[in-house]
Amino acid sequence: MAKLLSCVLGPRLYKIYRERDSERAPASVPETPTAVTAPHSSSWDTYYQPRALEKHADSILALASVFWSISYYSSPFAFFYLYRKGYLSLSKVVPFSHYAGTLLLLLAGVACLRGIGRWTNPQYRQFITILEATHRNQSSENKRQLANYNFDFRSWPVDFHWEEPSSRKESRGGPSRRGVALLRPEPLHRGTADTLLNRVKKLPCQITSYLVAHTLGRRMLYPGSVYLLQKALMPVLLQGQARLVEECNGRRAKLLACDGNEIDTMFVDRRGTAEPQGQKLVICCEGNAGFYEVGCVSTPLEAGYSVLGWNHPGFAGSTGVPFPQNEANAMDVVVQFAIHRLGFQPQDIIIYAWSIGGFTATWAAMSYPDVSAMILDASFDDLVPLALKVMPDSWRGLVTRTVRQHLNLNNAEQLCRYQGPVLLIRRTKDEIITTTVPEDIMSNRGNDLLLKLLQHRYPRVMAEEGLRVVRQWLEASSQLEEASIYSRWEVEEDWCLSVLRSYQAEHGPDFPWSVGEDMSADGRRQLALFLARKHLHNFEATHCTPLPAQNFQMPWHL
């Protein structure tokens, strides 16, 4: 009877992975009392085959889930319509509640029938036995056997806790349950006294901004968190997970962040290969509709690196909602997991981000300054210009206030706090992070990210002449035009390198540098062009084109 109840309440099983010979336990090693033998690919098909009763009951419950999601998103309009028609009176609500209660009872009955169907299936009984054994005892053998199954991630046991590192238990400087530290925007009116009257005046605007951010704004910014989109992408995500596990020997893990969100991760270890880049770990930060199953992790994987991918809060197996604070909390536990559980030193970690993933990448580089390098692909400096691009001009004040208070993705500000090597990849046909049209390459916000980085690190070089010539170089729409501008100013790379190395040897590596202070205008132009070319590479493609492995290059450093 207990097993039947477990089948009724158990998670949905999607797939049974092919077990690799290298992962099977040696015959000489005795099993623990709670260990259960996992199925081999020779006995069962790798795709879970539900019985007819479970299959039909699952279809009914999945349809009910879709209808509930549609009802949730349309509820404001539905309530408004019902109110206008007078259907929200007590005489109308009571019968409706009876219908809703009856429907819930019917769905509970369908769930019980699904449980009976699972109970009669030896594949599911084997799986639920392993899952229960792992929850009782998270031994390496039990976790190895559980990794052979792909199921609803909510039931996956937690593999790593944000407080697990001993240094955080002893130190009071780490993150609290409220979250890690973020850079906050400065008040808009610094000279105005923050009196009670001013607070009351601002209250309607603050309430409006909060409602916009938590309804329309968050879903527009992170469409991958919308349940209906995830439901449509589920077959593709399952195929992507199967490829990472079966072909790349990936290991899935659940991390618990300081805010209570559970973060879905996938780790591919290449340290045992002959390729030297396998000793480096690339932590990948996906875009606003990207998932590690089908996202930018493929680029460093093809290049031979060890890779750690993770999903934003609210994406696929990760819980929560993707607001900046939750995003930073998730990134924090991912980096801690890489260092304290996977055993990588910060000097062996590379942060790689695509598009909106630049926020968590720059936060990690700012908070963990010892990481080896950072690569930002198709990213931007600040969210406000891009948000204003897609909203009406009459909403400018509301949009700016909402972004600054609730969705402040200040990539450039965080990037300037990082002292290590940085490479920016600008897509010359980008249709997402341009503020006008894709053909207008100067409206690409990657330009502003580069300029802010160089102006912070080399303020004397990027004054007047240097800034002007870098803008000319950024206007080039082809490699031929770039080379023409570079050769026009007769940039001597050996001279530029010697100047920078001499300054570093005398003053140290910490930015900002005052190099160029006593330099001629021609020298500043040469140095500015040299630095711009080293920090930004062009890729002739649109925003969502996968980055080829040959374009995944380590950033330049002295």
From Swiss-Prot:
A single GO cellular-component term on record: membrane
GO terms of biological process kind: monoacylglycerol catabolic process; phosphatidylserine catabolic process; prostaglandin catabolic process
Notes on how activity is controlled: Inhibited by beta-lactone-based lipid inhibitors, such as beta-lactone palmostatin-B.
Keywords of this entry: Disease variant, Hereditary spastic paraplegia, Hydrolase, Lipid metabolism, Membrane, Neurodegeneration, Transmembrane, Transmembrane helix
The reaction(s) this protein catalyses: 1-heptadecanoyl-2-(5Z,8Z,11Z,14Z-eicosatetraenoyl)-sn-glycero-3-phosphoserine + H2O = 1-heptadecanoyl-sn-glycero-3-phosphoserine + (5Z,8Z,11Z,14Z)-eicosatetraenoate + H(+); 1-hexadecanoyl-2-(9Z-octadecenoyl)-sn-glycero-3-phospho-L-serine + H2O = 1-hexadecanoyl-sn-glycero-3-phospho-L-serine + (9Z)-octadecenoate + H(+); 1-octadecanoyl-2-(9Z,12Z-octadecadienoyl)-sn-glycero-3-phosphoserine + H2O = 1-octadecanoyl-sn-glycero-3-phosphoserine + (9Z,12Z)-octadecadienoate + H(+); 1-heptadecanoyl-2-(5Z,8Z,11Z,14Z-eicosatetraenoyl)-sn-glycero-3-phosphocholine + H2O = 1-heptadecanoyl-sn-glycero-3-phosphocholine + (5Z,8Z,11Z,14Z)-eicosatetraenoate + H(+)
GO molecular function, one term: monoacylglycerol lipase activity
Enzyme class, first EC level, given as a word: hydrolase
The enzyme's E.C. designation: 3.1.-.-, 3.1.1.23
Membrane topology summary: Multi-pass membrane protein
Effect of R252Q: In SPG86; uncertain significance
Cytoplasmic side: 114-558
Effect the entry attributes to changing N121I: In SPG86; uncertain significance
Domain AB hydrolase-1: 281-407
Transmembrane domains' residue ranges: 60-80, 93-113
InterPro entries per UniProt: AB_hydrolase_1 (IPR000073), AB_hydrolase_fold (IPR029058), ABHD16_N (IPR054518)
Active-site residues, Swiss-Prot/TrEMBL: S355 (charge relay system), D430 (charge relay system), H507 (charge relay system)
Main location class: membrane
Disease: Spastic paraplegia 86, autosomal recessive: A form of spastic paraplegia, a neurodegenerative disorder characterized by a slow, gradual, progressive weakness and spasticity of the lower limbs. Rate of progression and the severity of symptoms are quite variable. Initial symptoms may include difficulty with balance, weakness and stiffness in the legs, muscle spasms, and dragging the toes when walking. In some forms of the disorder, bladder symptoms (such as incontinence) may appear, or the weakness and stiffness may spread to other parts of the body.
Homology family: Belongs to the AB hydrolase superfamily. ABHD16 family.
PANTHER family named among the record's database cross-references: ALPHA/BETA HYDROLASE DOMAIN-CONTAINING PROTEIN, PHOSPHATIDYLSERINE LIPASE ABHD16A
The protein's role, per its UniProt record: Phosphatidylserine (PS) lipase that mediates the hydrolysis of phosphatidylserine to generate lysophosphatidylserine (LPS). LPS constitutes a class of signaling lipids that regulates immunological and neurological processes. Has no activity towards diacylglycerol, triacylglycerol or lysophosphatidylserine lipase. Also has monoacylglycerol lipase activity, with preference for 1-(9Z,12Z-octadecadienoyl)-glycerol (1-LG) and 2-glyceryl-15-deoxy-Delta(12,14)-prostaglandin J2 (15d-PGJ(2)-G).
Name of the protein in question: Phosphatidylserine lipase ABHD16A
Organismal lineage: Eukaryota, Metazoa, Chordata, Craniata, Vertebrata
